[in-house]
């Protein structure tokens, strides 16, 4: 588990778990929200339980808090990957069909690296890294798989 997520979970428990049992009850949530000046503590607690009490037992457990924090982190990561891939597509996908063709990469290399000693090798390397179905097109899905695996895209 990510250290930041663990710290967030511990902070939340410390603030809301008044009896120290490692769980947050609805009453504990309402009490804490009142103490912090919430305008509508019942509504805020209800919202909190809708989001966090996955098994609907009326108690938010440390496991549920960890799961929620991990879900939020995963969504942020997926959004970042999506943004990286969209920006990468913008740089190469000149015909705006949502994929990068062999010709688009050749044109990009010739335009942006005119002194390249082996431009065809650059294009071949690009496609060998990204084009998993060998159709001479790189799709957003292929970009996302690559970024998810390697945390970046190849540089040209």
Swiss-Prot record:
Domain (EF-hand) ranges: 4-39, 40-75, 80-115, 118-153
PROSITE patterns: EF_HAND_1, EF_HAND_2
Entry-linked PANTHER family: CALCIUM-BINDING PROTEIN (PTHR10827:SF85), RETICULOCALBIN (PTHR10827)
Residues annotated as binding Ca(2+) 1: 17, 19, 21, 23, 28
Originating organism: Dictyostelium discoideum
Species classification: Eukaryota, Amoebozoa, Evosea, Eumycetozoa, Dictyostelia
GO cellular component: actin cytoskeleton; cell leading edge; cell trailing edge
InterPro entries with a match to the protein in the record: EF-hand-dom_pair, EF_Hand_1_Ca_BS, EF_hand_dom
Name of this chain's protein: Calcium-binding protein A
Entry annotated with the keyword DNA-binding: no
Amino-acid positions noted as binding Ca(2+) 4 in the UniProt annotation, renumbered to this chain: 131, 133, 135, 142
Binding site for Ca(2+) 2: 53, 55, 57, 64
GO molecular function: actin filament binding; calcium ion binding; calcium-dependent protein binding
Keywords in alphabetical order: Calcium, Metal-binding, Repeat
One Pfam match: EF-hand_7
Binding site for Ca(2+) 3: 93, 95, 97, 99, 104
């Amino acid at each position: 588990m990510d250290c930041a997520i663990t710290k967030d979970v511990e902070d939340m428990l410390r603030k809301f778990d008044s009896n120290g049992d490692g769980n947050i009850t609805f009453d504990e949530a309402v009490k804490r929200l009142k103490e912090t000046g919430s305008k509508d503590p019942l509504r805020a607690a209800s919202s909190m339980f809708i989001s966090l009490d996955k098994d609907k037992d009326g108690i938010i457990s440390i496991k549920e808090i960890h799961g929620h924090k991990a879900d939020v982190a995963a969504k942020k990561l997926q959004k970042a990957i999506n943004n990286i891939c969209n920006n990468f597509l913008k740089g190469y996908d000149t015909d705006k069909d949502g994929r990068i063709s062999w010709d688009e990469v050749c044109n990009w290399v010739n335009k942006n690296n005119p002194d390249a000693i082996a431009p065809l090798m650059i294009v071949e390397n690009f496609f060998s890294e990204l084009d998993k179905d060998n159709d001479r097109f790189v799709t957003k899905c292929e970009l996302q798989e690559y970024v998810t695996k390697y945390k970046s895209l190849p540089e040209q």
